Amino acid sequence: MTKAVYWFDEPEDHNYPAGVEYLSLLVTPEVAKALTQRLRDAPISHFKAKDIFRASGLPLAGISNEQVEKTLHKIECEKKLSPLLLVRHMNSLVIADGYHRMCAVYQHDQDAKIPCKIV
């Protein structure tokens, strides 16, 4: 049986500035800040890891990635993870914060439901 993945009820405070930094590579800093404020206000939704992965169109970071390895260790130690921050953009999904968490959870159990804030 696959070990459960534990989650915080809400993203941690440091996830939002990280989201702004990443989104600022794709849109203007003003738009990135506005999107991040909308993410703060958004309710938590749940999506399967495999669906987030497919919608993002991103390659999967492997076990050799240090951040993925650290997150897999947290899962094994039953430590809580922070929900993802997602932005719908055109016909794709942008992972504003939580890419390595998504990759780790996908490798652990691709059918696991991941809590997310999505706008």
Label each PLM-derived region with a short phrase:
Residues 2-9, 81-119:
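A short, basic-hydrophobic beta/loop patch
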Residues 38-94, 106-107:
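Short alpha-helix boundary/capping and kink motifs at helix termini
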Residues 27-28, 65-68, 96-100:
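Short amphipathic alpha-helical surface micro-motifs
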Residues 1-65:
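An acidic, glycine-rich, mixed-charge low-complexity segment common to nucleic-acid enzymes
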